[in-house]
Curated annotation (Swiss-Prot):
<dbReference type="InterPro" id="IPR033705">
    <property type="entry name" value="Anticodon_Ia_Val"/>
</dbReference>
<protein>
    <recommendedName>
        <fullName>Valine--tRNA ligase</fullName>
        <ecNumber>6.1.1.9</ecNumber>
    </recommendedName>
</protein>
<dbReference type="Pfam" id="PF00133">
    <property type="entry name" value="tRNA-synt_1"/>
</dbReference>
<dbReference type="GO" id="GO:0002161">
    <property type="term" value="F:aminoacyl-tRNA deacylase activity"/>
</dbReference>
<dbReference type="InterPro" id="IPR009008">
    <property type="entry name" value="Val/Leu/Ile-tRNA-synth_edit"/>
</dbReference>
<dbReference type="GO" id="GO:0005829">
    <property type="term" value="C:cytosol"/>
</dbReference>
<dbReference type="InterPro" id="IPR013155">
    <property type="entry name" value="M/V/L/I-tRNA-synth_anticd-bd"/>
</dbReference>
<dbReference type="InterPro" id="IPR022874">
    <property type="entry name" value="Valine-tRNA_ligase_type_2"/>
</dbReference>
<dbReference type="InterPro" id="IPR014729">
    <property type="entry name" value="Rossmann-like_a/b/a_fold"/>
</dbReference>
<dbReference type="InterPro" id="IPR002300">
    <property type="entry name" value="aa-tRNA-synth_Ia"/>
</dbReference>
<keyword id="KW-0963">Cytoplasm</keyword>
<dbReference type="InterPro" id="IPR009080">
    <property type="entry name" value="tRNAsynth_Ia_anticodon-bd"/>
</dbReference>
<keyword id="KW-0436">Ligase</keyword>
<keyword id="KW-0648">Protein biosynthesis</keyword>
<comment type="function">
    <text>Catalyzes the attachment of valine to tRNA(Val). As ValRS can inadvertently accommodate and process structurally similar amino acids such as threonine, to avoid such errors, it has a 'posttransfer' editing activity that hydrolyzes mischarged Thr-tRNA(Val) in a tRNA-dependent manner.</text>
</comment>
<feature type="binding site">
    <location>
        <position position="539"/>
    </location>
    <ligand>
        <name>ATP</name>
    </ligand>
</feature>
<dbReference type="Pfam" id="PF19302">
    <property type="entry name" value="DUF5915"/>
</dbReference>
Length: 891
C-alpha cells in the first residue's frame, strides 16, 4: 500500500539498491532481439557530477529505459575518462609530489582517480542512472590502454601517423601542446599599436598596426594588399626593424585586410594562424622569441627573460620614445585562449615543436561523407561538424607533454625512424619498458623512448569500439566477434554541443579508419546548462547549483523532469521553480494512485477490458492513446521536452482534476455496472500512465508498480515491462468532444461554487443547461454532470433560455457627484432609487440624464452611476454562465 506522503528521499535509495541487487539492468547478449548499443560519454573523473552531467546522462537514461521497454537488447555501459592535466595538478597539490618522480606520480594519479570514480558512480546511481555497472570501463585500465595503442598501430600501418616540427598551439601555463579543438577565441578589450617602420633605403616609413608589439623581434616580413594604392609603390622594398636593426621585405598578399588598422601588417613567427600560412607560402625564415613558459628568449634581445605582457609594455614604451609608436587605440579583439579548461584560459602561443600527428586533412571529405550517413538530432548539428572539419588548417596534434596519460606505443631513433611496439606486448610504456629491438632496424642507431603521452581525445575517440569489443574481436576471440557484430555500429551517440568538434569528429575519424564504417546510426545533441540567471554557470557569477543541493530537497525524479524539459540542442537554464513545480506534480501523481489503489489493485482488468464503456471513459482513453502515440513518436526522435509537458498537463488536469473527479460518484455509487466500467477505464488509464512515466521518473513509478500492479503481473520491475500498446480502436473523436464539453461545464460550475464560497461537494438544488448543437452530447453525460457537481435537479433543455435582465439598483458615484451637488446628494440618491430604469435608459440613448431636484438641474453621465443588474427566469432570480453554445442557469 502506498504511504500517505510522497517522500523521494525514502523511496529513491530503496529502489536504487533493489535494482543493483536484482541486476535489473544486467546486459545479456541476445541475438534474437534487435541491438541497441549506447556509446555513452565517459565524464572526466573530477570527483563530482555537475548539472550538465545530470542533464546529458538523464537523457541517455530515458532513452535506455524506453528502448528496453520496446524490446531492444540494450547495451548500456558507462565509462570514465581518467587522464588529463587536472588530475596531475590535483596530485601535485594534494600529495606534494612532482612529475620528476614519474612512477610514484603515476601511482598517486591512479589512487586519486579511483576515489573520484567511486564518488561519481554513487552520484550516477543516485539520479537513477540505469547503466550496467558490470561493463564499466576506465581509460587508465591496462586493457583500455592496450586497445588505444592497438588502434594507433593500425593508424601507423596505414601511414596516418607522423612526427615533425610544426607550429602547434602551446599553453605556457599548462606547458603542453593542444589540439585546435581545445582552444578558442575570446573577445576582450586590448590595444592596437600603430608603429612607423623605417624603410631600409631611408626614403620614409610604412605604418603598420599590431596588437602584439612584443613580437617585433620575430618579424620576417611586412604585408600589404596588392590593390592598396597607398602601398603599391613600396612592394619589393625592405623595412629596417627598429631596435633590432634587421631588414625584412614588404610583400603583397590578398589575405591582407586593407581596412584593418593601417592596411599594413607585419608577419611574425608566429602571432596567429595567418602568420603560419604566409611563412609557408613565401618560404620565409622562422624566428622564435617565446619560451615554453611564456617568457621572451635570447632572440628578443634586450627583452629576453621578460614575461610576454612585460615585453609588450616595455617595447611599446621604447618605440614611443623613438617617435615610432604614434597611436595606441583601445579596441575589442579576439584572443586565442585555452578554452577547454575554464580553470586555465591562458593565452595560447604558436610554437614550432616536434610533435606527433594523425593525418586528418587528407580525410576531411571522407569524414564529412560518413558523418552525413548518421542521423543527427537536431539535424542542423551536422553543419557544426562540417564547418569545423572544413576549417582545419593542419592535422591533429596527438602528443601531450604530460605524465598521466596513455603512452605512445613507439620508440624513435636519433634519425627520426619510428619503431612500433609488438602487438603481443601491449600495453607498453616506453618510459619504463624495453624497446622490442636493441637498435633501429632501419639505420642501426640508438633507440629512445617516446616520453609524451596521448591527447585524451585519442583515448575517448574509440569508445564505440571499446564497448563493442573491437579490441578483442580483432584478436580472433569468437565471443567478442559475436558481440561486435551484434552491436556495431552502435545505435546511438549522446553528447553535448560543446564537444561536436572534438569527441564526435575524432570518433568518426577513428572508427572509419579502423572499420570502414560509421560509429553510430544516430547522434543526439543536448545543449549546455545555464545558471538560474540565464548565464553560463560560473563560480565568479555565483550562480552554480550542484545536484547535491537539489536532490535532498526535491528528489532525483523531480530533477530528472527538469532535464526532460530541455529542448534538443539548446541551452537549458536551471530553475528552482521548475523543479519545485515538478515535485508538486509528482505529489499529484502520488495522490492519484493512492486514491485509485483501493479501486484497481484487486480488479481483474483482463476479464473486463473489452466491455462497452461510458462516454467519459471513452474520452479519457482516447486521449490516453493519442498521448501514447505522440510519446512514442517523440521518443523515437529523441525529443523529450514536448512529451514531458504534454504528460504533465494531461495527468495533472485531464486525469486528476477532471476525469477522476467525474467518476468518483460512480466508484462510490450503487450502480455496479457503471462502477465496473469506471474501474476498467481507470485501470487502463493509470497502468499506461505509469508506463509512460517510467523512463522519466523511474523511482516513483517503481513504487507505484510494486504497491498496485506487481502482485498480478509478477515482473520484478516496472522497467522490465513493455511500452504501452497504442490501440487505434480506443481513438474516438466524438467521445473527445463530449469529454471536452463535460470538462468545460464542470469547470464553470466549480467557478460558480467558488465565487459563492461553497465547497466543491456542496449540493446545488436546481441547474438547467440550455443547448442547441450540444444537446445530444449533454444528454449522454447528464448523469455525470449531476453526479460530479452534486446537483439535486439538473435539466438539459434543447433551445435557448428565456431570460430577463432587470436593473435592480443604481448607485451614485459619490466622488463625482459629491463635489458637484453637495447637499443635494441624498435627494439625488432617492431619485435614482425611484427612477432607476428610466435614468439608465436615458443615459444609454442620449449619453446623459437630466432631471431637477429641489428646483435645481441635475445632469448625470454613465461615469456618475453604478448599475447593478440581475437575471430572472420565469420570475425567479438566477445566475448564468456560457460555455460555447451552452447556457448554464443556476437557480
Amino acid at each position: 500500500m502506498l504511504p500517505k506522503n510522497y517522500d523521494p528521499n525514502e523511496i529513491e535509495p530503496k529502489w536504487q539498491k533493489y535494482w543493483l541487487e536484482e541486476k535489473i539492468y544486467k546486459y545479456r547478449l541476445d541475438e534474437n532481439k534487435p541491438s541497441y548499443a549506447i556509446d555513452t560519454p565517459p565524464p572526466f573523473t573530477s570527483g563530482t557530477l555537475h548539472l550538465g552531467h545530470v542533464l546529458s546522462h538523464t537523457w541517455i537514461d530515458i532513452i535506455a529505459r524506453y528502448k528496453r521497454m520496446r524490446g531492444y537488447n540494450v547495451l548500456f555501459p558507462q565509462g570514465f575518462d581518467n587522464h588529463g592535466l587536472p588530475t596531475e595538478l590535483k596530485v601535485e597539490k594534494e600529495f606534494g609530489i612532482t612529475k620528476d618522480q614519474p612512477e610514484e606520480f603515476l601511482k598517486k594519479c591512479v589512487e586519486w582517480t579511483w576515489q573520484a570514480i567511486e564518488a561519481m558512480r554513487k552520484q550516477f546511481i543516485r539520479i537513477g542512472y540505469s547503466a550496467d555497472w558490470d561493463l564499466e570501463y576506465h581509460t587508465m585500465d591496462d586493457w583500455y590502454k592496450a586497445a588505444v595503442q592497438r588502434s594507433l598501430l593500425e593508424f601507423y600501418k596505414k601511414g596516418l601517423i607522423y612526427r615533425e616540427e610544426h607550429p602547434v598551439y602551446w599553453c605556457p601555463k599548462c606547458r603542453t601542446s593542444l589540439a585546435k579543438a581545445e582552444v578558442g577565441y575570446v573577445e576582450e578589450e586590448g590595444y592596437l599599436y600603430y608603429i612607423k617602420l623605417p624603410l631600409a633605403d631611408g626614403s620614409g616609413y610604412i605604418p603598420i598596426a599590431t596588437t602584439r608589439p612584443e613580437l617585433m623581434p620575430a618579424c620576417v616580413a611586412v604585408f600589404v594588399h596588392p590593390d592598396d594604392e597607398r602601398y603599391k609603390h613600396l612592394v619589393g622594398k625592405k623595412v629596417k626593424l627598429p631596435i633590432f636593426e634587421r631588414e625584412v621585405p614588404i610583400l603583397a598578399d590578398e589575405d591582407v585586410d586593407p581596412n584593418f588598422g593601417t592596411g599594413a601588417v607585419y608577419n611574425c613567427t608566429y602571432g596567429d594562424e595567418q602568420d603560419i600560412v604566409w611563412q609557408k607560402r613565401y618560404n620565409l625564415p622562422v624566428i622564435i622569441v617565446i619560451n615554453e613558459d611564456g617568457t621572451m628568449n635570447e632572440n628578443a634581445g634586450p627583452y629576453a627573460g621578460l614575461k610576454i605582457e612585460e615585453a609588450r609594455k616595455k617595447i611599446a614604451e621604447d618605440l614611443e620614445k623613438m617617435g615610432l609608436l604614434y597611436k595606441k587605440e583601445k579596441i575589442k579583439h579576439r584572443v586565442l585562449r585555452h578554452t577547454e579548461r575554464s580553470s586555465c584560459m591562458a593565452p595560447i602561443e604558436l610554437l614550432p615543436k616536434k610533435q606527433w600527428f594523425i593525418k586528418v586533412k587528407d580525410l576531411i571529405d571522407e569524414i564529412i561523407k560518413v558523418a552525413k550517413e548518421i542521423n543527427w538530432y537536431p539535424e542542423d548539428m551536422f553543419l557544426r561538424l562540417k564547418d569545423w572539419a572544413e576549417s582545419m588548417d593542419w592535422d591533429w596534434v596527438i602528443s601531450r607533454q604530460r605524465v598521466f596519460g596513455t603512452p605512445f606505443p613507439f620508440w624513435v631513433c636519433k634519425n627520426g625512424h619510428i619503431i612500433p611496439a609488438r602487438e603481443e606486448d601491449l600495453p607498453v610504456d616506453p618510459r619504463f619498458d624495453k624497446p622490442p629491438v636493441d637498435k633501429c632496424p632501419v639505420c642501426g642507431a640508438e633507440i629512445e623512448p617516446v616520453t609524451d603521452v596521448l591527447d585524451c581525445w585519442v583515448d575517448s575517440s574509440i569508445t564505440p569500439l571499446i564497448i563493442t569489443k573491437w579490441h578483442e574481436a580483432i584478436k580472433g576471440d569468437e565471443e567478442a566477434k559475436k558481440w561486435f557484430e551484434h552491436n556495431f555500429p552502435t545505435a546511438l551517440r549522446p553528447q553535448g554541443t560543446d564537444i561536436i568538434r572534438t569527441w564526435a569528429f575524432y570518433t568518426i575519424l577513428r572508427t572509419y579508419v579502423l572499420t570502414g564504417k560509421k560509429p553510430w546510426k544516430d547522434i543526439v545533441i543536448n545543449g549546455m546548462v545555464a545558471g538560474p540567471d540565464g548565464r553560463k554557470m560560473s563560480k565568479s557569477y555565483g550562480n552554480v547549483v550542484s545536484p547535491e543541493e537539489v536532490i535532498p530537497k526535491y528528489g532525483a525524479d523531480a530533477l530528472r523532469l527538469w532535464t526532460a524539459l530541455a529542448p534538443p540542442g539548446e541551452d537549458h537554464p536551471f530553475k528552482w521553480e521548475t523543479v519545485d513545480y515538478n515535485y508538486r506534480f509528482l505529489q499529484k501523481v502520488w495522490n492519484i494512485y493512492r486514491f485509485a489503489e483501493r479501486h484497481i489493485k484487486d480488479f481483474d482488468y483482463e476479464k473486463y477490458r473489452d466491455v462497452e464503456l461510458e462516454p467519459l471513459d471513452k474520452w479519457i482513453l482516447s486521449r490516453l492513446h493519442r498521448i501514447i502515440k505522440f510519446a512514442t513518436e517523440e521518443l523515437e526522435r529523441y525529443r523529450f521536452n514536448l512529451i514531458t509537458r504534454e504528460l504533465i498537463t494531461f495527468i495533472w488536469h485531464e486525469v486528476a482534476d477532471d476525469y477522476i473527479e467525474m467518476i468518483k460518484y460512480r466508484l462510490y455509487g450503487e450502480d455496479e455496472e457503471s462502477k465496473l466500467k469506471a474501474k476498467v477505464a481507470l485501470y487502463e488509464l493509470l497502468y499506461n500512465v505509469m508506463l509512460l512515466l517510467a523512463p522519466f521518473v523511474p523511482h516513483i513509478t517503481e513504487e507505484i508498480y510494486h504497491a498496485i500492479f506487481k502482485e498480478k503481473i509478477g515482473e520484478k520491475s516496472v522497467h522490465l515491462l513493455s511500452w504501452p500498446e497504442y490501440r487505434e480502436d480506443r481513438i474516438d473523436e466524438e467521445a473527445e468532444k463530449i469529454g471536452e464539453l463535460a470538462r468545460k461545464i464542470v469547470s464553470e460550475m466549480r467557478k460558480y461554487k467558488n465565487s459563492h464560497g461553497l465547497p466543491l461537494n456542496a449540493k446545488l438544488k436546481h441547474v438547467a443547461i440550455y443547448a442547441l448543437d450540444s444537446y445530444e452530447r449533454l444528454k449522454l453525460i447528464e448523469r455525470d454532470i449531476a453526479g460530479t457537481m452534486n446537483i439535486e435537479r439538473l435539466e438539459i433543455v434543447k433551445g435557448e433560455p428565456h431570460l430577463e435582465e432587470r436593473i435592480v439598483e443604481v448607485k451614485p458615484n459619490y466622488k463625482n457627484i459629491g463635489p458637484k451637488y453637495g447637499k443635494l446628494v441624498p435627494r439625488i440618491v432617492q431619485y435614482l432609487r425611484e427612477n432607476a430604469e428610466s435614468i439608465v435608459r436615458e443615459i444609454k440613448e442620449k449619453g446623459k440624464a437630466e432631471f431637477e431636484v429641489e428646483g435645481k438641474k441635475v445632469e448625470l453621465t454613465k461615469e456618475d452611476i453604478t448599475v447593478r443588474k440581475e437575471v430572472f427566469s420565469e420570475g425567479e432570480k438566477v445566475e448564468t454562465s456560457v460555455v460555447d453554445d451552452v447556457v448554464i442557469v443556476f437557480f
